[in-house]
Amino acid sequence: MTKFIFVTGGVVSSLGKGIAAASLGSLLEARGLKVSMLKMDPYINVDPGTMSPLQHGEVFVTDDGAETDLDLGHYERFVQRNFTKRNSFSTGQVYEKVIRNERRGDYLGGTVQVIPHITDEIKHRIKLAAAGADVALVEVGGTVGDIESLPFLEAIRQLGVEVGRDRAMFMHLTLLPYIAVAGEVKTKPTQHSVKELRSIGIQPDILICRSERPLEESEKRKIALFTNVEEKAVINSLDARTIYEVPRMLHEQGLDRLVTDRFRIDAPVADLSDWDDVVQAQLNPEKSVEIAMVGKYVDLTEAYKSLIEALIHGGIQTKTQVNIHYIDSEDLEKDGIGSIEKMDAILVPGGFGERGVEGKIAAIQFARENNVPYLGICLGMQMAVVEFARHVAGLPSAHSTELDPKTKTPVVALITEWTDENGQLVERDEKADLGGTMRLGGQSCALVEGSKMRDIYGEDVIRERHRHRYEVNDGYIAKLEAAGLKISGRSEDGNLVETVEIEDHPWFVACQFHPEFTSTPRNGHPLFKAFVEAASQHKQTTH
């Protein structure tokens, strides 16, 4: 039967619960166990799909099309399996389902309450996500003490009682602030955080204590005494040089052993040689490259979390230190392209809305005209098509209908609207073959033989994840191709453009999908590996 590890956080947010949970998941997986992971978010939004990246960070897309919290990305990068929409849910989804049940009369006229109706729905969803796993790690978003988290904490308390101590553990992540003036670590915030947790009926079995410096044994004893946690279960999580050191750090303090002993699981010792290889490659590069990421959310780099990690993975695969320069595309509009002129490669990521778009187009034009390696993703591909149409294909008014609904040259348009070769608007409703207005999740793409993309992937048909409403307009493809833009990949039905490249450019590649969502530190991703290699080659030939 599935065992449960409930992961909570205290003192402050952004301590790294997701990394800690994912690291423990990877340790248990390395012991031969089947692991499932679940993130429960206490916000009332149904999902993060409509939330500003500057508030929430990245929206991670699963293969089955769920728009989820960025922690799902950590889970997939650390645990070698794809998760689904069952592995992430929010307060909004729970309330939506309970209210829908009430409207149908499922509660037989009873008063609908947080307990038991909301908590029962939460427990039901936890069990669905855990189905078939040996161990399920369940992360509660937010911080203990937040009013929004209370229904989730009550639900995991109940579930812990229902399955019993032999099948449930509680792991609490806290901060131990170091006061430089006093020269000591303060344990009081952790004591109060655990006290808050115990007041609602949850006694932590494991404490993960984040700190800047190693804990003394006396400090561990003090924490154990005041929190009623075994001393051996007080785990010190230091600031790591790379997040991929964390599994080894936690393993050396016996975290996975605590779990297997508690659950009476007879499992082999974890082999972490693959993690050691990753860390060794990342911390001991043989060369370096400078890559400009030109976007509109650069004030919060969490908005590009998977993309940043994918570039790091490309560096790991090629023994290259990837130095990412975050360039605000609006600054390029105001100040010119001076900040990207000495870069070894340029990347324009996905995004929505017109703000900063002309800066992205300027960066793309610079990359194209100066033979700088370029990778465009989602909006980065659409703007590459717009730039090429304007400056090469003789279509100076080219634009996307997302950004200029009245454009006379819509080289990029909503999936449900197309301009044919005669300039006539073709409209399809959401029930037509092209689907709805948002294309989400894994889709197959057929690559053209002899193209750079085909060479990079080494496969005729690939599967990548999408999140977009707009596509390259088929009505302009003949003119774009005649000017030198190569359509190197299409959806398997041939209707939608998936990848483009410029044949007479050393390395100019763009894709409609998001390859960063399938990159992992141990296996990397062929597109990011090739991009980093191209940046390194450009550096060698120009500097």
Swiss-Prot record:
UniProt entry tagged with the keyword Protease: no
**Per its UniProt record, what Gene3D superfamilies does this chain match?**
3.40.50.880, P-loop containing nucleotide triphosphate hydrolases
- Active-site residues are 378, 514, 516
Catalytic activities: UTP + L-glutamine + ATP + H2O = CTP + L-glutamate + ADP + phosphate + 2 H(+); L-glutamine + H2O = L-glutamate + NH4(+); UTP + NH4(+) + ATP = CTP + ADP + phosphate + 2 H(+)
Pfam families given for it? CTP_synth_N, GATase
> Which residue ranges are recorded for the region named Amidoligase domain?
1-265
For the ligand (UTP), the binding residues are: 13, 186-191, 222
GO CC terms in record: cytosol
Binding-site residues, ATP? 14-19, 71
Stated EC number for the protein is 6.3.4.2
Q: Kindly list the positions annotated as binding Mg(2+).
A: 71, 139
MF terms per GO, please?
ATP binding; CTP synthase activity; glutaminase activity; identical protein binding; metal ion binding
What processes does the entry annotate via GO biological process terms?
'de novo' CTP biosynthetic process; pyrimidine nucleobase biosynthetic process
> Which pathway does UniProt place it in?
Pyrimidine metabolism; CTP biosynthesis via de novo pathway; CTP from UDP: step 2/2
In what residue span(s) does the Glutamine amidotransferase type-1 domain sit? 290-541
- Record-annotated residues binding CTP? 13, 146-148, 186-191, 222
Q: How is its activity regulated?
A: Allosterically activated by GTP, when glutamine is the substrate; GTP has no effect on the reaction when ammonia is the substrate. The allosteric effector GTP functions by stabilizing the protein conformation that binds the tetrahedral intermediate(s) formed during glutamine hydrolysis. Inhibited by the product CTP, via allosteric rather than competitive inhibition.
- Which EC class does it fall in? ligase
Alphabetically list the UniProt keywords: ATP-binding, Glutamine amidotransferase, Ligase, Magnesium, Metal-binding, Nucleotide-binding, Pyrimidine biosynthesis
Summarize where L-glutamine binds, as residue positions: 351, 379-382, 402, 469
The record's comment on protein family reads: Belongs to the CTP synthase family.
**What does it do?**
Catalyzes the ATP-dependent amination of UTP to CTP with either L-glutamine or ammonia as the source of nitrogen. Regulates intracellular CTP levels through interactions with the four ribonucleotide triphosphates.
Extra remark beyond the main annotation: CTPSs have evolved a hybrid strategy for distinguishing between UTP and CTP. The overlapping regions of the product feedback inhibitory and substrate sites recognize a common feature in both compounds, the triphosphate moiety. To differentiate isosteric substrate and product pyrimidine rings, an additional pocket far from the expected kinase/ligase catalytic site, specifically recognizes the cytosine and ribose portions of the product inhibitor.
Q: Which PANTHER family match?
A: CTP SYNTHASE, CTP SYNTHASE-RELATED
Q: How does it assemble?
A: Homotetramer.
Q: List the protein's name.
A: CTP synthase
UniProt organism field: Hydrogenovibrio crunogenus (strain DSM 25203 / XCL-2) (Thiomicrospira crunogena)
